[in-house]
Amino acid sequence: MAVSMACARPLISVYSEKGETSGKNVTMPAVFKAPIRPDIVNFVHTNLRKNNRQPYAVSKLAGHQTSAESWGTGRAVARIPRVRGGGTHRSGQGAFGNMCRGGRMFAPTKTWRRWHRRVNTTQKRYAVCSALAASALPALIMSKGHRIEEIPEVPLVVEDKVESYKKTKEAVLLLKKLKAWNDIKKVYASQRMRAGKGKMRNRRRIQRRGPCVIYNENNGIIKAFRNIPGITLLNVSKLNLLRLAPGGHVGRFCIWTESAFRKLDDLYGTWRKSAKLKADYNLPMHKMTNTDLTRILKSQEIQRALRAPNKKVKRRELKKNPLKNLRIMMRLNPYAKTARRHAILQQLENIKAKEKKPDDGKPKAKKPLDAKTKMIKLAKAKKRQARAEAKTAEAKTAESK
C-alpha cells in the first residue's frame, strides 16, 4: 500500500478508469498542508447543523382546556387548581400545573426561539481547509472507519473522463478497479433499522458513510454515482463541511477528479499568493512551522534571549521546638547548656547529702497511719493474741495430765 507516502510526495499520480496510473502527475495543492484544527471543525459543524432545524412548539391551549379552580386553604390539600364537578375520577384532580397529569409543560416551547446561528466566513473556510488537509492523511481516514487498505494512493485522483459517466455500472466498475469497493461493502454491511421513534418519521434505515466523490463539472457523474449507497457527491466550488467532516470529525475518504484537484489552488490559494476565486483570502498559517520543539528551544536565537538559569536552591527551613531540642535552644540561649548542667549537678549533690546524713539518736517521727492500715494491724494483733492464748491453754492441759 502506497498510502504511507501521502503528503510527503510533492506530486500525486492520476489514475485511469482501469485503476492504473495514467502517467500524468498533479502537484499537491497547498490546502492539504493547512493546519488541522478539530476544535474549529467541530464548532463550525455544530453551528451549521443548527441551520437545518425546523421550528416546533406545543399548542398555546395545551393543558388549559379544562375548567378548574383552586379550593383555597383550609381543606388540607394543595392549593393547585382542581377540576370541578363530581361523578367521575377526573373531578377533584389537579390541573394546569406542570406537576399535574394532563397539565401544561413548564415553559411551553415557542416557534420564535433562536434556531439559526451565524458563523464567520473565514472560520467556515478554516474548517473546510482543515477537513481537506485531514482527508490526505491515511491514519485519520482509517480512524474514521474507511476501508482504504488496498487503494493505491491518498489523496486518490482519477481522470476527468469519470465526470462523463452516466451509468451506475461504470461507476461500480471504477470503484472496483481502484480497490475502493471495500468501503462500499462496509456500507452494505452496516445497513440496519434505526433505534427509537425516528422509524415513524421517515427515517427508518441508517448506514455508514462511504467515499466522497468531488468533481469539477457534472456531465452525468451525479446520475452514475448517486444510487450507490454511502457515496456523497460534491462540486469542488461548493464544498460542504457537513459532508467533508460528518459528525464534526475529520478524515473523510475523498476521490477527486483531475480538474477538481487542480482547481484547489485557485480556490484556496497558497501561502505565496492569495486565492483567485475568493476575494482577499489566504490560507491559514501554522502556529509552528517546525514541530521539533527541542531544536527550537536549543537554538542560538532562543538561548540568547533567555537569562541564565538561577541555580540557587532555596530550601524550606525546618522549624524545631527549642524546649525539646537542646541544639536549637543553645543557638537561642548559649547559657542554657550551663544552666541545665548546673541543675543536674545540684540534684546529684542533694541525693548524696541525703545518703550521708548522720543519725542523731532522736526517734524519727512516725507517719500517721490511715484507717485501712490501722484495721489491718489491729486484725494481725488479734490473731497473734488468739494464737498465744491457744498455746497457753495447751500448756496447762499438758501439766494437768
From Swiss-Prot:
InterPro entries: Ribos_uL4_C_dom, Ribosomal_uL4, Ribosomal_uL4_dom_sf, Ribosomal_uL4_euk/arc_CS, Ribosomal_uL4_euk/arch. Residues 351-373, 386-401 have a biased composition (Basic and acidic residues). GO terms for cellular component: cytosolic large ribosomal subunit. The keyword Cytoplasm applies. It comes from the Eukaryota. It is found in: Cytoplasm. Residues 374-385 have a biased composition (Basic residues). The keyword DNA-binding does not apply. Belongs to the universal ribosomal protein uL4 family. Component of the large ribosomal subunit. The ribosome is a large ribonucleoprotein complex responsible for the synthesis of proteins in the cell. Component of the large ribosomal subunit. This is Large ribosomal subunit protein uL4B. It comes from Xenopus laevis (African clawed frog).
